């Protein structure tokens, strides 16, 4: 006991023991926070996580988290299947950064399948389906193949097929400055080849490739027939992108794509699976329908090795129906996206934080991972979505401004560089005719009308808007910034992994606090003028 004038203080060394005298810990546990009878429906801005004890560096935090029952990502970030967000470029770079991109379906089945192939061919361990040409293939045709697939270095076999005798390789250097486009590649190809024999493991093959200083290493059988390849560029990518999301067997990038629940989507899915698809997302604003349940059961029967993510859902009742049908993951959110007006127009939906907690806590009992889809405007929202039980978060508007998104870049009236972005429920998206080949029946094939059950409507009711978002630079800088911010947030909470975060939220170790309107104002910037740089 210490005395200071008229004040008597406790011994400072007893602080931890005195703390135990308090009946309640600071803040709220997750159940008190999410009690809708007391709090109502909550959004991400309505609460904060309270800090814990930091006993480790942020670099020690791991972000591994499942997106489906069978597939785990090293970065829990997913790009949305919107036609101004995710095509093959976005899907490739999201996968390279440890996340995954979901390719939209507001295009023809063949176009979507081509995008899947580009993702799967981008980075390989053993390339089991290389692009093979014959001696008679022209230089012009080889250049066209390079333009189409985005890579060069084509093996030449007698028949032009895998399994045929290898006779040479055409590299970029062989055709780069060749002006005679009709010349057969037999006149320019490399015939002095370094190869490896079938049965070699990936580590040994990579060593041979590194020592050979060649760009490609063909793998042949005892008869000299081509069976597979490995690429030097993939070795480089492995060094630059150690977190890349890859399949365990082929070492190809993981690729996801969305489809609808119409009968013709079964044919679309068959083409996507043939192209190498790993995950299919059933794209609907309201997933608890007879159409989606029937589609889930059909997919699990026809393609048992394909992971299926159902949704969207915001209640336990919706989730239960899809879990019972056999989904491998769920997508949570209705009306919370930045370009979505479903809650306003339809008066149906749910505040995102409340939806994520209620659905994910129920789905966790069945081992079904959940994606928090919508309402993500910053790193803090990502943290909150994961703290409420989601395994990953899906982003649309936050990624639409990146270089890799397919949206059009332009200068706004204010002189700022922006990119076009639209909700799939917007009139612009629902009237897009690419999916139907531009025909008069294109509305029936449109991804937007399918998502919002409007294929046969004579009057389209918008559930989204069109606009623009600020240009954010490359995914290769923006996603690492999001991941670094997430690690520092978990460090502040005293959590070393997302699994630990989920466990400590459930057992009450991680605490929360409701934010009043004044508290939200206090937590923002309060300056006359300022410049907000997100990362450097």
UniProtKB/Swiss-Prot annotation:
Activity regulation statement: Mycophenolic acid (MPA) is a non-competitive inhibitor that prevents formation of the closed enzyme conformation by binding to the same site as the amobile flap. In contrast, mizoribine monophosphate (MZP) is a competitive inhibitor that induces the closed conformation. MPA is a potent inhibitor of mammalian IMPDHs but a poor inhibitor of the bacterial enzymes. MZP is a more potent inhibitor of bacterial IMPDH.
An example molecular function term from Gene Ontology annotations: metal ion binding
Active site (UniProt): 340 (thioimidate intermediate), 451 (proton acceptor)
GO CC terms, sorted: cytoplasm
UniProt pathway annotation: Purine metabolism; XMP biosynthesis via de novo pathway; XMP from IMP: step 1/1
Keyword NAD: yes
Catalytic activity: IMP + NAD(+) + H2O = XMP + NADH + H(+)
Residue span(s) of domain CBS: 126-187, 189-245
SUPFAM superfamilies in alphabetical order: CBS-domain pair, Inosine monophosphate dehydrogenase (IMPDH)
Pfam families (alphabetical): CBS, IMPDH
Annotated localization: Cytoplasm
Cofactor(s) of this protein: K(+)
Ranges annotated as spanning the membrane: none
Biological process according to GO: GMP biosynthetic process; GTP biosynthetic process
EC number: 1.1.1.205
Keywords from the named record: CBS domain, Cytoplasm, GMP biosynthesis, Metal-binding, NAD, Oxidoreductase, Potassium, Purine biosynthesis, Repeat
UniProt: IMP binding residues: 338, 373-375, 396-397, 421-425, 463
NCBIfam families: IMP_dehydrog (TIGR01302)
UniProt subunit comment: Homotetramer.
Biological role: Catalyzes the conversion of inosine 5'-phosphate (IMP) to xanthosine 5'-phosphate (XMP), the first committed and rate-limiting step in the de novo synthesis of guanine nucleotides, and therefore plays an important role in the regulation of cell growth.
Family under the similarity heading: Belongs to the IMPDH/GMPR family.
Protein name: Inosine-5'-monophosphate dehydrogenase
Gene source species: Neurospora crassa (strain ATCC 24698 / 74-OR23-1A / CBS 708.71 / DSM 1257 / FGSC 987)
């Amino acid at each position: 006991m210490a005395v200071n004038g008229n004040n008597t203080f406790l011994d400072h060394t007893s602080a931890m023991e005195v703390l135990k005298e308090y009946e309640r810990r600071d803040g709220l546990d997750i159940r008190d926070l999410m009690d809708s009878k007391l709090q109502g429906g909550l959004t991400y801005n309505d609460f904060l996580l309270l800090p814990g004890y930091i006993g480790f560096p942020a670099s020690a935090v791991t972000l591994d988290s499942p997106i489906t029952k069978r597939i785990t990502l090293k970065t829990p970030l997913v790009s949305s299947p919107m036609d101004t967000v995710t095509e093959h470029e976005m899907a490739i770079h999201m996968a390279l950064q440890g996340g995954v991109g979901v390719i939209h379906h507001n295009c023809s089945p063949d176009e979507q399948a081509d995008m899947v192939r580009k993702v799967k061919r981008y980075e390989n361990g053993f390339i089991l389906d290389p692009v093979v040409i014959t001696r008679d293939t022209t230089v012009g045709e080889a250049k066209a193949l390079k333009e189409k697939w985005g890579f060069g270095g084509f093996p030449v076999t007698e028949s032009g097929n895998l399994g045929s005798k290898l006779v040479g390789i055409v590299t970029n250097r062989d055709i780069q400055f060749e002006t005679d486009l009709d010349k057969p590649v037999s006149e320019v190809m490399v015939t002095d080849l370094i190869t490896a024999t079938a049965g070699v493991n990936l580590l040994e093959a990579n060593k041979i490739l590194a020592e050979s200083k060649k760009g490609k290493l063909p793998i042949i059988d005892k008869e000299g027939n081509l069976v597979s390849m490995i690429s030097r560029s993939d070795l480089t990518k492995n060094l630059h992108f150690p977190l890349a999301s890859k399949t365990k067997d082929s070492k190809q990038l993981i690729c996801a794509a969305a489809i609808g629940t119409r009968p013709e989507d079964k044919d679309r899915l068959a083409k996507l699976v043939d192209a190498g698809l790993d995950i299919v997302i059933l794209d609907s604003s309201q997933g608890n329908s007879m159409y989606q349940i029937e589609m889930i059961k059909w997919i699990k029967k026809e393609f048992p090795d394909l992971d299926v993510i159902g949704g969207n859902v915001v209640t336990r009742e919706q989730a239960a129906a899809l879990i019972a049908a056999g989904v491998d993951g769920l997508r949570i959110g209705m009306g919370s996206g930045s370009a979505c007006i479903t809650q306003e127009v339809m008066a149906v939906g749910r505040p995102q934080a409340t939806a994520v907690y209620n659905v994910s806590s129920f789905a966790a009992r069945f081992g079904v991972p959940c994606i928090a889809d919508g309402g993500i405007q910053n790193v803090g929202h990502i943290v909150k979505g994961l703290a409420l039980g989601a395994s990953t978060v899906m982003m649309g508007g936050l990624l639409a401004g990146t270089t890799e998104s397919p949206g059009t870049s332009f200068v706004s009236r204010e002189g700022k560089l922006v990119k076009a972005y639209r909700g799939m429920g917007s009139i612009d998206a629902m009237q897009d005719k690419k999916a139907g080949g531009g025909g008069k029946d294109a509305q029936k094939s449109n991804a937007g009308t399918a998502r919002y059950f409007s294929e046969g409507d004579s009057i389209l009711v918008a559930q989204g808007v069109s606009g623009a978002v600020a240009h954010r630079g490359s995914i290769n800088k923006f996603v690492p910034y999001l991941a670094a911010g997430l690690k520092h947030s978990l460090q502040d909470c005293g959590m070393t992994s997302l699994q630990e975060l989920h466990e400590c939220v459930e057992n009450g170790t991680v605490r929360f606090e409701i934010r009043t309107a004044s508290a939200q104002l206090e937590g923002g910037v309060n300056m006359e003028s300022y410049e907000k740089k997100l990362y450097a």
